């Protein structure tokens, strides 16, 4: 569950990225992550635990330093015991930005879930620290995490597997590699099971920057598919058997690109910046 924001403070940015973000000639997503983490004063901790590729963390360390971050530390967790180590907790306390790499989201949540590190990351985000993640590192940011599922575009009972995430937000359900891996159906199904939450489907090289004001801003070369169940009038997901299609009425779907926004408080999507750029 998200930590409470102390009076007089603002929550930090939450930045899920759809994976395969540009790390070479157009680093605008990672550059903006550094910017909202403090720009040239950014103090970033990279957590590559979801990945089994040892060079993953060092690659992001190199990029964030090149983008002007003042300090970058790679911090891997191999055991749950690591999550209680005072030195690691102190380093997370010092960070102004925390970044999760891609890999396997279940590896990450089963190591970190319920630990002092997970609790501290929620507390730090509630006190203004930006937290981002790419691919599997994006999925784990929310409370209701998509752990797997089937390809396709329809709502089908039992077609998605859900597990507890890190719980920085309970207002969204996040999926990644969205268009590239045909994941509309599993996001729709996840939202059908959890109609309190808004679904965010992130194409590759595309991010949703969720601000302290709960406005989603899109950055990157692809699209964000946003599934809003706030006006659903009927759902049969609770009565159909696994493998069978379900009915939902009143579901709203928005396709957002860079410059478009969605306000979670008002449930209003906007393309004002896009229309102004054409004038």
What role is predicted for each listed range?
Residues 105-115:
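Glycine/threonine-rich flexible loop motifs
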Residues 83-97:
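N-terminal small/polar loop signature for handling phosphorylated ligands or for N-terminal nucleophile
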Residues 15, 45-47, 73-74, 99-100, ...:
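Structural recognition of the beta-strand scaffold that forms the well-ordered cores
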Residues 91-94, 114-128:
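Catalytic-core regions built around general acid/base machinery
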Residues 100-102, 121-145:
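Catalytic nucleophile loop
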Residues 76, 102, 125, 170-178:
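Short, structured patches in soluble enzyme cores that scaffold and shape functional sites
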Residues 1-40, 46, 51-59, 64-67, ...:
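C-terminal and late-domain segments of enzyme folds
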Residues 49, 74-82:
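Short beta->alpha junction loops
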